[in-house]
Amino acid sequence: METSVSEIQIETKDEKRPEAASPQKERQERKTATLCFKRRKKVNKKKAKAGSKTAEETEKHAPEAGGSGQRQPAGAWASIKRLVTHRKPSESAEKQKPSEAEMQPEDGALPKKKTKSKLKIPCIRFSRGAKRSRPSKLTEDSGYVRVQGEADDLEIKAQIQPDEQATQAKSTQGLQEDVIVRDGKEIQESHISNNVISGEHVIGIELELEKESSALRMRTPGSEKEAKVILVKQGVQVQEASVLENSAADSPQPVTSTAPLSPATTHQLGLEEPSDSIRESAPSGKDDGRRKTAAEEKKSGETALGQAEEASSVSQADKSVLSQAEEATVGHTEEATVIQAQSQAKEGKLSQAEEATVAQAKETVLSQAEEVKLSQIEEPAISQAKKATVGQAKEAYVSQAEEAIVGHTEKATMGQAEEATVGHIEKTTVGQAEEATVGQAEEATVGQAEEATVGQAEEATVGQAEEATVGQAGEATVSHIEKTTVGQAEEAIVGQAEEATVGQAEEATVGQAEEATVGQAEEATVDQAEEATVGQAEEATVGQAGEAAVGQAEEAIVAQAEEATVGQAGEATVGQAEKATVGQAEEPIVGQAEETVLRHASDLKVNGVDAEKPRSEESKRMEPIAIIITDTEISEFDVKKSKNVPKQFLISMENEQVGVFANDSDFEGRTSEQYETLLIETASSLVKNAIELSVEQLVNEMVSEDNQINTLFQ
């Protein structure tokens, strides 16, 4: 019942607007409606007999109704006759169809045919007394005929109202059955004659509506669809009361509802208006009495049969219709509403709501266009701003990074340069200082040693040296020492020992030569030599001058010493002694020198006097310091007469009381062997003392230097 009532209510709403706006269309619709009602009333008498014939004829003329408004009533009658036998299933199934057709008006030829089938269902119900369903489905057919017969309906109502009042419902039903018994030709002719007046107008309007519907199907948005469907449901609920009043009052004009019209409902009203006009104009074609009887029959039929039939069919139909309506209304009602809205807009009948929606749509479109323009304008500005900010940030970051890198590199380079320069300066200064100190120490020590030794050696050795001692001792010892020590000196030379050995050798030669030379040499040369050797050894170890530089310095110093000593002390003994000292520079040299001395002493044993064997262990423990032993053998001479004989030498000789000298109280009978033993003893004692002192000093200085170096590295 809800679907049928909704259709009827929509018809009443739509009838208000077209009657006020275009009375001519309402007259045309009423004329066509009156004819339809007359024939339908006649059909109700004999609908079982002529159902098959009319169905065939309506099927033939159904395609013609899609092109013009004349064919629409014929299609409706044919559909009624076809569905008379299948009354109950057809009503429920076709109630669903009209709901879809109402939402899909004027979509083309196919939706028009569907609407005709919807009209067939109400005709069936009207014939049997289900009068509520009949007008609801007639409204669907009248959607196409509305524009055709509005003017004709008004004229027919004015002429036929007195006739309808006089006639009764029975006569109207008899007439309807008679008309149904007639051939389909008469039915079609009656429809055609009623619709001839507005046929041309209907065709033009339908063509326009079809074009508009095809053009606007895709334009309506989904949001409008949902809104329209909701409005249609509200209109249906509001208009149920008005439909009941129309059926009760049975007035010729449709009852209007006070509910506001939506664009979706306006279109459905436009489609369903002719059905109401037809329903009311049919009794006006004969009598007002017929109208009253028809109304009474409608009431009784609707209450009795409608409640029974519609209770089952409408409940099912409502469910299916609502489900299908919701699905179909989304796609089709929008097109229908848009089409009718455009048709009304052409005629100047747009409502305020439509104007508001149009204005809102325009505003939204304009706002969207403005937003698009603004976005297009803002995008380049934003991109430029981004580029500028990115460039500035990059520049700032690069500048900061450069500053940091430059500062860091400057610090690193400065630190490295400072370290390099400091190290270089330290190296250069140390090297220069070492060179200067070494040169100065060498010059001082060599000069002092040369002066002391040369002066003393010249006086003592030259006067004491004789042909015998030089020939015997010089040839034997010097030749043997040269062969052994010079070869060893070439293999290993140490600069630290050379300077000390030169001073010590000079001291030894001075001690062996004379007492004065021994005392002065011990005091002056030994002290100076120790200081010089210690300073030079420290400088050499710290600077690590190198073997080549040391060797060159040694050669120069030795050459100078050789020149002075050779010229002053004697060509043979002094030159050979210096060569021997140069070669004997290391520990093995010391041991070898001692061994050579022992060998030489053993070779020189003439009177059975044995030379003292030096302690090899002590010599090996000593640092590499060369030992110079000058064998200046003195032949027989008077010690008392000689002034240059050292006192220590004499004292040692007196204390030892050697067996050889026991018989000689005046020391006049001393031989060369005796002098040799004395010289060896004195030389060995002097060398031991000097070596011990120098070694201790060197060790202490080395330890102190190592500590200083470690502190610097830490």
Curated annotation (Swiss-Prot):
The annotated subunit structure for this chain is:
Binding protein for dimer of the RII-beta regulatory subunit of cAMP-dependent protein kinase (PKA) and also for the protein kinase C (PKC) and the phosphatase calcineurin (PP2B). Each enzyme is inhibited when bound to the anchoring protein. Also binds the beta2-adrenergic receptor. Part of a complex containing AKAP5, ADCY5, ADCY6 and PDE4C. Interacts with ADCY8, and enhances its phosphorylation at lipid rafts. Interacts with ORAI1 (isoform alpha) (via N-terminus) upon store depletion and in response to LTC4. Does not interact with ORAI2 and ORAI3 paralogs.
Descriptive protein name: A-kinase anchor protein 5
Which residue ranges have biased composition labelled Polar residues? 243-268, 310-323
Q: How is it modified after translation?
A: Palmitoylated. Palmitoylation at Cys-36 and Cys-123 plays a key role in the targeting of AKAP5 to lipid rafts. Palmitoylation by ZDHHC2 is required for AKAP5 function in LTP-stimulated recycling endosome exocytosis.
Output compositional bias ranges, type Basic residues. 37-50
Instruction: List, as start-end ranges, the regions of compositional bias called Basic and acidic residues.
Output: 10-32, 54-63, 88-100, 285-301
GO cellular component terms, semicolon-separated: asymmetric synapse; basolateral plasma membrane; cytoplasm; cytoplasmic side of plasma membrane; cytoskeleton; dendrite; dendrite membrane; dendritic shaft
Q: Where is this region: Tethers NFATC2 to CRAC channels?
A: 697-714
PROSITE patterns annotated for this entry? AKAP_CAM_BD
Key words, A-Z: Calmodulin-binding, Cell membrane, Cell projection, Endosome, Lipoprotein, Membrane, Palmitate, Phosphoprotein, Postsynaptic cell membrane, Repeat, Synapse
Membrane topology per the entry is: Lipid-anchor
Stretches for region 28 X 8 AA repeats of V-G-Q-A-E-E-A-T: 305-597
Place the motif AKAP CaM-binding on the sequence.
Answer: 74-94
Region of interest (Disordered), ranges: 1-146, 243-333
Chain residues carrying a lipid of type S-palmitoyl cysteine: 36, 123
Question: sequence repeats located where?
Answer: 305-312, 322-329, 330-337, 350-357, 358-365, 366-373, 398-405, 414-421, 430-437, 438-445, 446-453, 454-461, 462-469, 470-477, 486-493, 494-501, 502-509, 510-517, 518-525, 526-533, 534-541, 542-549, 550-557, 558-565, 566-573, 574-581, 582-589, 590-597
Give me the ranges of the annotated region Essential to the intracellular anchoring function.
Answer: 1-164
Q: What is known of its domains?
A: RII-alpha binding site, predicted to form an amphipathic helix, could participate in protein-protein interactions with a complementary surface on the R-subunit dimer.
Checking InterPro entries in the record gives:
AKAP5 (IPR042375), AKAP_WSK (IPR001573)
